[in-house]
Regions:
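Short aromatic-acidic-glycine turn motif
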Residues: 139-147
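Bacterial Sec-dependent N-terminal signal peptides
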Residues: 1-20
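Aromatic (Trp/Tyr/Phe) and Gly/Pro-enriched flexible surface segments
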Residues: 17-109, 118, 129-131, 146-265
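Extended, low-complexity, turn-rich repeat/linker tracts enriched in Gly/Pro/Ser/Thr and Asp/Glu
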Residues: 120-128, 140
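Beta-strand signatures of extracellular beta-sandwich domains
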Residues: 133-135
Length: 268
């Protein structure tokens, strides 16, 4: 039997296909109503791990976009974004927050993926840092909030000394990830230990001093909302950033080759 090896056009081209579900945080069933953490309830396919970030959306009067208790910033894409603590100058060295996003399908072993997200330093943040990254995982870490095995091992990280200090423009963090296979979730946050998390005062006391204890101008505000005032005081000792437009895109395509027998060829 004559066998003709032919490409039948069965090409599975995934190049350019966005894999992150709700990466711009637009799909939500509830409008955020409070500064207090709420475990990101009502935001489709987005979860917190351990301490909860804050969801900002233009539909809210308290945590709105562009104006909110953390400052003023338009979204990179759409009407919403996340706010998260990366590191802190106060006594709690574990004071940080993480956002977990779900992928449309598991990553494939040996395949390469373009990973990117956009960050912006909140106006009210007392400090800035260069430490933010991303980790892929096969498990849903939001259930138990366990991340200790990922600390010090980010799959993607912002370059050292590239401080996330821009309060106006969004800064892009990107790179390429070689998948192990089976990864279904992406977690964004600071994956370095406290001692490896550089911090600089947003408004240094003198020169370019590091770890200067700067009280934010927000403390001078006579805010009638006690919760908001409490968060503003905490913000003055934190490196707090905004997060938007998280993306994972496959690089290249897969081409499947099939066998074309003489019988199949005649049937076409």
């Amino acid at each position: 039997v004559l066998l003709i090896i032919a490409i039948l056009g069965c090409v599975q081209d995934t190049h350019g296909q966005e894999l992150v579900v709700n990466g711009s945080f637009e799909d939500h069933s509830k409008c955020p109503r409070s500064v207090a953490p709420n475990k990101l309830k009502g935001i489709s396919n987005v979860r917190s791990v351990a301490s909860s970030p804050t969801y900002f959306n233009s539909c809210s009067q308290v945590v709105g976009v562009p104006q909110n208790w953390a400052g003023h910033q338009t979204a990179k894409d759409g009407e919403g974004y996340m706010g998260m603590v990366l590191t802190s100058q106060n006594g709690d060295r574990t004071d940080r927050q993480y956002v977990q996003l779900e992928l449309k399908e598991p990553l494939q072993n040996g395949h390469r993926y373009a990973v990117s997200f956009w960050v912006n330093a909140a106006d009210g943040s007392g400090y800035v840092t260069d430490r933010i990254g991303a980790c892929f995982t096969t498990m849903d870490r939001s259930r138990k909030g366990v991340l200790h095995d990922l600390i010090g091992k980010p799959d993607l990280e912002n370059p050292l000394d590239r401080f996330l200090s821009d309060t106006t423009a969004w800064m892009k963090v990107d790179g390429t990830y070689n998948a192990k296979g089976g990864e279904r979730f992406l977690i964004v946050g600071n994956f370095q230990r406290y001692g490896y998390s550089s911090r600089k005062a947003m408004i240094p006391n003198s020169g370019n001093s590091v770890l200067a204890n700067v009280e934010s101008n927000y403390l001078e505000m006579n805010d009638p909302d006690p919760d908001r005032g409490r968060f503003l005081r905490a913000l003055s000792k934190q490196a707090y950033c905004l997060l938007d437009e998280v993306s994972v895109v496959p690089l290249g395509s897969n081409v499947s080759v099939d066998l074309l027998t003489q019988e199949r060829a005649c049937a076409i």
